[in-house]
Amino acid sequence: MAFASEDIAYHSSNAVYRVPSNRHEADQEALLGKPLDYPAPGLQRPEDRFNGAYIIFFCLGIGGLLPWNFFVTAKEYWAFKLRNCSSPASGKDPEDADILNYFESYLAVASTVPSLLFLVANFLLVNRIRVHVRVLASLSVSLAIFVVMAVLVRVDTSSWTRGFFSIAMACMAIISSSSTIFNSSVYGLTGSFPMRNAQALISGGAMGGTVSAVASLVDLAASSDVRDSALAFFLTAAVFLGLCVGLYLLLPQLEYARYYMRPVVPIHVFSSEDSPPRDAPSTSSVAPASRAVHTPPLGPILKKTAGLGFCAVFLYFITALIFPAISTNIQPMHKGTGSPWTSKFYVPLTVFLLFNFADLCGRQVTAWIQVPGPRSKLLPILAVSRVCLVPLFLLCNYQPRSHLTLVLFQSDIYPILFTCLLGLSNGYLSTLVLMYGPKIVPRELAEATSVVMLFYMSLGLMLGSACAALLEHFI
């Protein structure tokens, strides 16, 4: 994929984003009024030869979300492991039935709550622990957890399903925490790069979901044992996490990456009208240790990103409210026919694969089109308009349902169309928001701002997951 003059158009805090029409002149202004990036004397901006950095960030994006996606898409495996909790009529505590029936909601809560807490921790650690340490440590923890889950695949847990459920939730919480540290650290790193690299990382996350959904379909078709499928999931995730370690270690070897990863000036909050002091020190003279004593200024970052933050929270709130808790429980209208389409492949194909592929397409479009801009009033309007998707999904054939009995959309094509719309809108709008965030602040605050943007995202996911768990009980 060719990106002409990306170092000029997408450069750090002075990026001028591209739009296809002059009708949006207000959105074509520079994201910051004054240059805030000080190139080291004698250095010229190198080119990303063979798109090496772009490919690495794309792969790191896959590795960042692949663990969570493999956990979620292994629905048949969790149902198999928790099968003793499927019916309260079997003499089990009625609470056991909730473990299986609402497993996706519990999984989402176990994922989003620790994620939110560790984003706060990562914000405090931005200038205290090197990004190199945070990235490698988080990858190592995720790798260890997947090894544990792979071992548990062959362990008979039928006599202690509640214990296994607790272990699964704990593993999900640890995976989510380590993935949060990894994602926010790498995303913060891209804040110092041209904007196309952030787009690569974010699109890679959607590719991770697509890869896991395809793997789920292949395993369902090739294997009759859900344990074999789960083992393949977990081992694949472990291998890819190991690959991410190697790719991250390779990144600083690229001249292009070294240029943008060089130290920056100490934190000083500039306004969009301020000019940097003429005697500002060059980046090459700043000792890395000088950053260790500073905590990024939260107030100015929150003020600068308030509008984008609202969009991020609302976008991910609606997405988490629907996917996966609601959408995975929409059943085909002719489920009892015995067809593999209605019994085996419907949810993996029409929910996980379709949503993740649509999400990927939406994110990839932002490589060429960035409309509306970060200051446009249209952006929050589009984000809020997605609330219309919630009743559309609820009026499909959601099961089980005891209060809302009306099924308005009595055809399988409707949830497919709604899922495409959910994925496309989530991918396109959320990528715009996440790309814009680190570009409306000085370069030295880009990493901290990236963490704040992911905090907004996780807050939306947590609220959406919690509301989805409540909504399921009222349908």
Swiss-Prot record:
Q: Tissue-wise, where is it found?
A: Widely expressed. Highest levels in heart and liver (at protein level).
Q: Name one GO molecular function term.
A: organic cation transmembrane transporter activity
Q: Mind telling me which Pfam families this protein's record contains?
A: Nucleoside_tran (PF01733)
Q: List the residue ranges of the region (Disordered).
A: 272-291
Q: Which GO terms describe its cellular component?
A: Golgi apparatus; late endosome membrane; lysosomal membrane; mitochondrial membrane; plasma membrane
Annotated keywords: Cell membrane, Endosome, Glycoprotein, Lysosome, Membrane, Mitochondrion, Phosphoprotein, Transmembrane, Transmembrane helix, Transport
Lineage: superkingdom: Eukaryota
Q: Where are the residues marked Important for acidic pH-dependent nucleoside transporter activity. Acts as a pH sensor as a site?
A: 219, 447
Q: Which residues cross the membrane?
A: 52-72, 106-126, 133-153, 163-183, 200-220, 231-251, 306-326, 341-361, 378-398, 415-437, 451-471
Q: Which InterPro entries match?
A: Eqnu_transpt
- Kindly report the protein's main subcellular placement as a broad class: membrane
Q: Does the keyword ATP-binding apply?
A: no
Catalytic activity reported: adenosine(in) = adenosine(out); guanosine(in) = guanosine(out); inosine(in) = inosine(out); uridine(out) = uridine(in)
Location of the motif Dileucine internalization motif: 31-32
Q: Which regions of this chain are Cytoplasmic-facing, per the record's topological domains?
A: 1-51, 127-132, 184-199, 252-305, 362-377, 438-450
**Which residues point to the Extracellular side?**
73-105, 154-162, 221-230, 327-340, 399-414, 472-475
Where does the UniProt entry place glycosylation sites?
Answer: 84
- The answer to whether the entry has keyword Phosphoprotein is yes
Its BP terms in the Gene Ontology are:
adenosine transport; cytidine transport; dopamine transport; guanine transmembrane transport; inosine transport; norepinephrine transport; nucleobase transport; nucleoside transmembrane transport
Where's it found, cell-wise? Lysosome membrane; Late endosome membrane; Mitochondrion membrane; Cell membrane
The annotated topology with respect to the bilayer is:
Multi-pass membrane protein
The protein's role, per its UniProt record: Uniporter that mediates the facilitative transport of nucleoside across lysosomal and mitochondrial membranes. Functions as a non-electrogenic Na(+)-independent transporter. Substrate transport is pH-dependent and enhanced under acidic condition, probably reflecting the location of the transporter in acidic intracellular compartments. Proton is not a cotransporting ion but most likely change the ionization state of the transporter which dictates transport-permissible/impermissible conformation for nucleoside translocation.
Give the record's family classification. Belongs to the SLC29A/ENT transporter (TC 2.A.57) family.
Q: What is known of its domains?
A: Contains a N-terminal dileucine motif (DE)XXXL(LI) important for endosomal/lysosomal and mitochondrial subcellular localization.
Q: What is this protein called?
A: Equilibrative nucleoside transporter 3
* Species the sequence originates in: Rattus norvegicus
Which lineage is the organism of this entry classified under, starting from the top rank? Answer: Eukaryota, Metazoa, Chordata, Craniata, Vertebrata
What gene is this protein translated from? Slc29a3
